[in-house]
Swiss-Prot record:
Belongs to the polyribonucleotide nucleotidyltransferase family. This is Polyribonucleotide nucleotidyltransferase. PANTHER family: POLYRIBONUCLEOTIDE NUCLEOTIDYLTRANSFERASE (PTHR11252), POLYRIBONUCLEOTIDE NUCLEOTIDYLTRANSFERASE 1, MITOCHONDRIAL (PTHR11252:SF0). It comes from Haemophilus influenzae (strain 86-028NP). Coiled coil: none annotated. Component of the RNA degradosome, which is a multiprotein complex involved in RNA processing and mRNA degradation. The gene is pnp. Residues 552-611 form the KH domain. One of its GO terms (molecular function) is magnesium ion binding. The keyword Transferase applies. Gene3D superfamilies: GHMP Kinase, N-terminal domain (3.30.230.70), K Homology domain, type 1 (3.30.1370.10), Nucleic acid-binding proteins (2.40.50.140).
Length: 709
């Protein structure tokens, strides 16, 4: 084995690419490392196409092995299971920039597998996996129009930082990943702390410029270690079949794409498609339906794109920069903590916000360490939202990705835990969909959070932009429909406040998207966002002053950290009885901060009073009401403030001589006692003699009564 190694500097890190020693039966395999974070990436490509295959079957799998961080998996089976949400998101991050670089008509099955085998807690594996995938595909010889580069851009002290460490990312106002070829940006995924459009674009350009180092290094690596390029030729178009489909369908499709209502339009298009298939297969039974459908779909694209480039109205009759009609309702679900329905044209999201306590936080065990997530965002896309039937079950990759994008859009305006001590969960149920459902989720989430009384810093809105480009002509579209997303050249989603951008996601299917085009798209998106925010502010101008009556209220008090063990009790008995008897939940921090969550304020006050009793200091000379807990021959034990026990000696029970303790006291009896002494070991000596004359008067345990003469 003679491994081939390529090493280069990338920002502050050293990247190493190695091939030829491991997984030699795969089409290509690369061990990619960046400062001890190592990802092993393999590519397997089938030489033959499956019979009847009419799409490109690319699969990207990203998997993290716990041994990479020197850990053993938890759970009963002690091995890795199904992909986590983080693994799914990184698999999508790898997939999105490489998929557009395979030629049209290439239907050979390809599987990319990225396995994290070593991890430096300061270096995130996602970037390493993207670089490794780019290198492996370039070495494999498949018709891949790469390589791609990938860069992470941070923004610290008003300076862009290339590939910041995990520690630096905590100080950064931006987390942006950009991928592209030597000529063009293909993918952007980002989260920002309200930056301007100009700053976001500058970050994209900066990242694309810096990643040229990776692209050049991969090209040099491929010259030395690459396999011969596949002798693949794109299938020749069947001009006779194309002309037949055009003759039957072109005029009718033109009319169908003037129907503004989605379901009616789809019914008409399906009828035309069925007619085209029936007519052509009747003439020649050997022609496959899939080839007819491919030509039919291409014709649809030509019609829609041609009209947009020519300046004609869009599918639903709008101009290029018009946002669909908006409809907003808040407080729609009576027993939830906050809710809203956001409707934009034929896209609708029901967003619901729920407030919880710290124990509801999600504990995420990542390779780079364990962390707690206090803001949860879940996106559901049921089949009925597009008028279809289908499986209902665990979230798919798309739902996880859309949920994360929407969360990124809202995260920047969420209050800190110190400002608002609640765990917040938002669920977006997509009830109708015709494009831009993730951005509808951002708008709906912002409204639901304000309805729940969450003091977000500002309202957030999101908008999806599209692009149609033919040679030098291009048109940027605001608030794209599902069809415009499918038939266009760019999907460009922007979320933000009136002050700036909180999230940007970009997927570009073609080369030639210049910074100038991106700037136009960003400016047009800003205009649309301001319009949407204006309508949202009319519905609910600010967060509600108070949280829902059905939400838990969190009360905070401080105790001496030395007293924490007293509140918890032996084996947790004390705190357990407090929560069970009052229906509250209690969390105690190491610094003595006690957080009590209760729907009923009286229950919370009751618990706070009882905790104050438990932690209260017993004062010598003070009189307390106590309860007899047990009897002995030499006296009685009495629980006073905070269930602290003291001894009333038999000689201190009454003025007269006491022969038998049980003649005077019984277990459970309430008596007034005075603290005579607290010795060095903390033992309390009590007396029932020399008390105030009115025995039955209850003594406030928080304000001990002074000894009376």
């Amino acid at each position: 084995m003679n491994p081939i190694v390529k090493q280069f500097k990338y920002g502050q890190h050293t990247v190493t690419l190695e091939t030829g020693a491991i997984a030699r039966q795969a089409t290509a395999a690369v061990m990619a490392s960046m400062d001890d974070t190592t990802v092993f990436v393999t590519v397997v490509a089938k030489k033959d196409v499956k019979e009847g295959q009419d799409f490109f079957p690319l699969t990207v799998n990203y998997q993290e092995r716990t041994y990479a961080a020197g850990k053993i998996p938890g759970g009963f089976f002690k091995r890795e299971g199904r992909p986590s949400e983080g693994e799914t998101l990184i698999a999508r991050l790898i997939d999105r920039p490489i998929r557009p670089l395979f030629p049209e008509g290439f239907f050979n099955e390809i599987q990319v597998v990225a396995t994290v085998v070593s991890v430096n807690p300061q270096i995130s594996p996602d970037l390493v996996a993207m670089i490794g995938a780019s290198a492996a595909l370039t070495l494999s010889g498949v018709p891949f129009n790469g390589p791609i580069g990938a860069a992470r851009v941070g923004f610290i002290d008003n300076q862009f930082v290339l590939n910041p460490t995990m520690a630096e990312q905590k100080q950064s106002r931006l987390d942006l990943v950009v991928a592209g070829t030597d000529k063009a940006v293909l993918m952007v995924e980002s989260e920002a702390d309200i930056l301007t459009e100009e700053q976001m674009l500058a970050a994209v350009v900066f990242g694309h410029q810096q990643q040229q180092v990776v692209i050049e290094a991969v090209k040099e690596f491929a010259k030395e270690a690459g396999k011969p390029r596949w002798d693949w030729v794109a299938p020749q178009p069947n001009t006779d079949l194309i002309n037949k489909v055009k003759a039957i369908a072109e005029a009718r499709l033109g009319d169908a794409y003037r129907i503004t209502e989605k379901q009616a339009r789809y019914e008409q298009i399906d009828a035309i498609k069925a007619d085209v298939i029936a007519q052509i297969t009747a003439e020649d039974e050997e022609i496959s339906e899939s080839k007819i459908v491919d030509i039919f779909t291409a014709l649809e694209s030509q019609i829609v794109r041609g009209r947009i480039i020519a300046g004609e109205p869009r599918i639903d009759g709008r101009t290029v920069d018009t946002v669909r009609a908006l409809d907003i309702c808040t407080g729609v679900l009576p027993r939830t903590h906050g809710s809203a329905i956001f409707t934009r044209g034929e896209t609708q999201a029901l967003a619901v916000a729920t407030l919880g306590t710290e124990r509801d936080a999600q504990i995420i065990d990542e390779l780079t360490g364990e962390r707690q997530d206090h803001f949860l965002f879940h996106y559901n896309f049921p089949p009925y939202s597009v008028g279809e039937t289908g499986m209902i079950g665990s979230p798919k990759r798309r739902e996880i990705g859309h949920g994360r994008l929407a969360k990124r859009g809202v995260a920047a305006v969420m209050p800190s835990l110190a400002e608002f001590p609640y765990v917040v969960r938002v669920v977006s149920e997509i009830t109708e969909s015709n494009g831009s459902s993730s951005m509808a989720s951002v708008c709906g989430a912002s409204l639901a959070l304000m309805d729940a009384g969450v003091p977000i810093k500002a309202a957030v809105a999101g908008i999806a932009m599209g692009l149609v480009k033919e040679e030098e002509k291009f048109v940027v579209l605001s608030d794209i429909l599902g069809d415009e997303d499918h038939l266009g050249d760019m999907d460009f989603k922007v979320a933000g406040t009136r002050e700036g951008v909180t999230a940007l996601q970009m997927d570009i299917k073609i080369e030639g998207i210049t910074p100038e085009i991106m700037q136009i798209a960003l400016n047009q998106a800003k205009s649309a966002r301001m319009h949407i925010l204006g309508v949202m502010e009319q519905a609910i101008p600010a967060p509600r002053a108070d949280i829902s009556d059905y939400a838990p209220r969190i009360y905070t008090m401080k105790i001496d950290p030395k007293k924490i063990k007293d509140v918890i009790g032996k084996g947790g008995a004390t705190i357990r009885s407090l929560t069970e008897e009052t229906g509250t939940s209690i969390d105690i921090d190491d610094d003595g901060t006690v957080k009590i969550a209760a729907v009923d304020s009286n229950a919370a006050k009751n618990v706070m009073g009882r905790i104050e009793e438990i932690v209260a200091e017993v004062e010598a000379g003070a009189i307390y009401k106590g309860k007899v807990t047990r009897l002995a021959d030499f006296g009685a034990f009495v629980a006073i403030v905070g269930n602290k026990e003291g001894l009333v000696h038999i000689s201190q029970i009454a003025e007269e001589r006491v022969e038998k303790v049980s003649d005077y006291l019984q277990v459970g009896q309430e008596v007034n006692v005075k603290v005579v002494e607290i010795d060095r070991q903390g033992r309390i000596r009590l007396t029932m003699k020399d008390l105030a004359p009115k025995q039955e008067t209850e003594i406030n345990q928080e304000d001990p009564v002074e000894e009376q003469e």
